[in-house]
């Protein structure tokens, strides 16, 4: 058995400005920092053996801030996967016993919003119509201009999960994933076997952990950590 913790990053500066963010590398706002800390309080008693984040800073900030509350007191360290940099994260002392490896991958990035990135969501709805923007944001296979649909996002997130994260769970390793609304929606769609219609209405608030227990045969959703 193993725990899988999924956490959408805390609010970013652009979330608060109501702008499409996508792959633009925007940091957390003060509210987002507070949300990450509260999320850390919520999961502080759950065992964590390794951490995965996207390549975007708001995802990394959320994971690092949350882990400052963890009862293990272990320190996350970024593992460099590039062969030319791999030696940089090697630890040559027993300090390794007080660390938790953290892996970053663009496979977990938010969906790429293409030509909507940086645009105000309200003004975009006024320009293209609310139904068109809703279709871009919530439908399964319709992508914004030069961007990704949720289906496209799942084409990178799900293989990464199945090839890299799931084997760890099968080996009873507890995994914490800090990522984004749409990258996590695509993973939850796969984990819970949701239909296209069901994922259409799936909303993930910022800074609220979702916890699954891998039983060895299936994923079971953990009771809510927040009231």
UniProtKB/Swiss-Prot annotation:
Keywords: Gluconeogenesis, Glycolysis, Isomerase. Transmembrane segments: none annotated. Coiled coil: none annotated. The keyword tRNA processing does not apply. Substrate binds at residues 8-15, 21-22, 58, 110-113, 121, 137-138, 181-182. One of its GO terms (biological process) is gluconeogenesis. SUPFAM superfamilies: Phosphoglycerate mutase-like. Its EC number is 5.4.2.11. Catalyzes the interconversion of 2-phosphoglycerate and 3-phosphoglycerate. This is 2,3-bisphosphoglycerate-dependent phosphoglycerate mutase. It comes from Chlamydia abortus (strain DSM 27085 / S26/3) (Chlamydophila abortus).
């Amino acid at each position: 058995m193993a725990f899988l913790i999924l956490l959408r990053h805390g609010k970013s500066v652009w979330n608060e400005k109501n702008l499409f963010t996508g792959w633009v590398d925007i940091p957390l706002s003060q509210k987002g920092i507070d949300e990450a800390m509260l999320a850390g309080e919520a999961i502080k008693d759950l065992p964590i053996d390794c951490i995965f984040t996207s390549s975007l800073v708001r995802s990394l900030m959320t994971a690092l801030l949350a882990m400052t509350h963890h009862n293990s007191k272990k320190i996350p360290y970024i593992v460099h996967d590039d062969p030319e940099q791999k030696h940089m994260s090697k630890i040559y002392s027993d300090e390794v016993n007080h660390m938790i490896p953290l892996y970053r991958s663009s496979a977990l990035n938010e969906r790429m919003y293409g030509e909507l990135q940086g645009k105000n969501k309200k003004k975009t709805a006024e320009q293209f119509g609310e139904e068109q923007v809703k279709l871009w944001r919530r439908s399964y296979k319709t992508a914004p201009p030069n961007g990704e649909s949720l289906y496209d996002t799942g084409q990178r997130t799900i293989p990464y999960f199945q090839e890299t994260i799931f084997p760890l769970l099968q080996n009873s390793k507890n995994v914490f994933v800090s990522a984004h609304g749409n990258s996590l929606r695509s993973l939850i769609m796969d984990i819970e076997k949701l239909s296209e219609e069901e994922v259409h209405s799936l909303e993930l608030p910022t800074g609220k952990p979702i916890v699954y227990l891998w039983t060895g045969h299936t994923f079971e959703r953990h009771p809510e950590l927040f009231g």
